[in-house]
Amino acid sequence: MMGKIMGTLILILMFMNLGAPPSNSVVIFENESVNPFENLYKAICEVESSGNPLAIGDRHLKEWSYGICQVRRSRLTDYYRRTGIRYSTSDMFDPAKAKEVFMYYCMDYSPSQFMEISRSWNGGYDYMKKNSTIQYWNKIQKQL
């Protein structure tokens, strides 16, 4: 019964030309940007901090890491040198700022190079020399 009523209503609207905009109309949809690194970002945050934006890691090392994706001071120094945007380690407790830094470095690679991005995020620019970054990549793959 309901189906017949809906069908009749649709036919009436079509005949009254209320069912669609005139042909010279334009419909604009909000632009949703596509970020090929979003899943990689989420996986790295899970491995690095279990998603905790207030995490402090690597306390056993000379240089600690901070925030949801565990950013080190040396990374922030390089980010400032490249972009002119100066963040402190405490800024990395803000997930939006940490994500901004992470995504900047992702753009140095093509979207298909998740392994290289992940390993360099973990091991720095000489990640290829560090076997530990292979183990890190294996953890990331499980989260993707």
Regions found by a protein language model. Name each.
Residues 2-3, 114:
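Structural motif marking the loop-to-transmembrane transition
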Residues 22-144:
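Catalytic glycan-binding domains that act on GlcNAc-containing polysaccharides
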Residues 3, 9-30:
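Bacterial Sec-dependent signal peptides at the C-terminal "C-region" and cleavage site
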